[in-house]
Amino acid sequence: MLDPTLLRQQLAKLAECLLTVRGFTLDVAALEALESERKRIQVHTQELQSLRNSKSKAIGQARSKGEDVSALMAEVAAFSDDLKASEIALEEIRTELEKVALDIPNLPQQDVPLGADERENVEQARWGVPRTFDFAIKDHVELGACHGWLDAESAAKLSGARFTVLRGPIARLHRALAQCMLDLHVSQHGYEEVNVPIIVNADSLHGTGQLPKFEEDMFSTQLGEHRRYLISTSEISLTNLVRNEIIEADRLPLRMVAHSLCFRSEAGSGGRDTRGMIRQHQFEKVELVSVCKPQESEGEHHRMTRCAETVLEMLGLPYRKILLCTGDMGFAATKTYDLEVWLPSQGMYREISSCSNCGDFQARRMQARWRNSVTGKPELVHTLNGSGVAVGRAMIAVMENYQNADGSITVPEVLRPYMDGLSRIG
């Protein structure tokens, strides 16, 4: 959520900026009307509260002198209903304003390129050279079918479209990838491993920005009156660990990593990537989350992105680093780097990691703060999140980049200790 003072004091400028850089239309007239009404009700409420306080003081003084207070009590009773109604009206209009504020996306940093969509993203760097094959290559679906490793038919019987059953060596490779990533981030990158719930409440989704705007993207479950949501990323669970907390300065930065199942409805995918495992309803991800002081978030963003890059480099997978333009960034992000891995079957790079600095946007929604050791006062933290990386897509990239002419897959050296020394599967 943006700083409310921007909505109150710089509304026209904010609306122009949001339209230009985010393509988001803010109803200025409606907001001005709401804010004007809020001020009117607040002034009226404060006047009645002041009157109540003065009358209460007068009643106390009169009682101490043994005087009759019935007339004063009658005066208080006369406006108490009005005060109660005014307080309720004030709370209602504040809730209305907050609903509007919760739908407004974050503002980009000044160095984020202006653009409408992914076509205007800016490539920052490349690593590795795509392999040249001397045989007809297969995509991951064909490779999986050769050995019965990827079973979409059974998954469809169990759950429907966009699910896959992994069998045998490929299931083992998938597990090895996740374990290897966790070990790297914990042992070498200094992240704390956290095992988090994958079912969360609505407050958690409001905190990180998935609700109320993106409810259609979420799977949910209802038990009696209690509605819960399946996480689309463990960023939700990890980041909300600091919701309504004040963190001492010497504990920052907090760096957490989790490997979890993730669930997405893919409501806005428009029928893209229906073949294979590129876009699934259920998938696994190793997620990185950092919570830090505001002045440290830019450096932390570069560090986190570098940690994700290291995963691809240790696997020997060619990739490129992309700075997203204003029109392609996520709702809560103020700056985002995507990492795209090379898929030989498609002859192109595909997203495998997205690392975002959210500034104080999520922290304000969560009331996540740190205690400034100089002033002693609580201030909003900055939050960051990034895939370190998507496990299924890493598996696809390994299958395709390490395939052999006979359909077997060479196991990357870094994964062999996790697979009892196997150098090849299939």
Swiss-Prot record:
Its main location: cytoplasm. Keywords: Aminoacyl-tRNA synthetase, ATP-binding, Cytoplasm, Ligase, Nucleotide-binding, Protein biosynthesis. CDD domains: SerRS_core. Its EC number is 6.1.1.11. One of its GO terms (cellular component) is cytoplasm. It catalyses: tRNA(Ser) + L-serine + ATP = L-seryl-tRNA(Ser) + AMP + diphosphate + H(+); tRNA(Sec) + L-serine + ATP = L-seryl-tRNA(Sec) + AMP + diphosphate + H(+). Belongs to the class-II aminoacyl-tRNA synthetase family. Type-1 seryl-tRNA synthetase subfamily. This is Serine--tRNA ligase. It comes from Xylella fastidiosa (strain M12). The lineage of its organism: Bacteria, Pseudomonadati, Pseudomonadota, Gammaproteobacteria, Lysobacterales. The gene is serS.
